[in-house]
Amino acid sequence: MAKNNNEIIIALDIGTSKVLCLVADYDDDDNLRIIGVGQDECTGLNKGVVSEINSTVASIKRAKDKAANMSGNKIESVITGIAGDHIKSYNGNAEVNILNDEVTIDDKEKVIDMAADMDIPPDQEILHIIPQYFSIDGQMGIREPVGMAGKRLAVNIHLITCSSTAKKNLNKCIENSLIDADEYVLQPVASSYSCLLYT
């Protein structure tokens, strides 16, 4: 995640109508706290795809400056939300033998990588690999298999991809605003995290 200074998290949401920049930190109880907000009108995007670079860059800069001034933090890198008609999703699965009859982190990573190794259109790139559930020797619904005993480990995943061109143009706008895009997150996924983790 994009953290500057003492665990500062900075998020950037570039939408069709507005750009929103949020700066957050953690309080003493480790709860996320918003300390800076910047918003500006955006006219350079159409359905999640950049249609005009210069106006998008200007909007990002204004939103960034407002958030930086409110929070008192310099904004150098961000987590960026991404969405649009170019987003695609696929389901995949795979199965591997469990060495030494106990699931290791390597086993878990291997089966996920195998499930994600599928043919996707050449103009798309992987955005998220989301494990839905694991199974061991046919026992389904396992959320965390590491450390469990068994012979065969399987996984079902949900693969989310985005247009490489759309992401590159979005990245160009961010970089031209003198910011590094550390990470891209599908906007509905980011929304689900906020609902499930912070309520």
Label for each model-derived stretch:
Residues 1-18, 22-197:
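Nucleotide/phosphate-binding catalytic cleft detector across ATP-hydrolyzing
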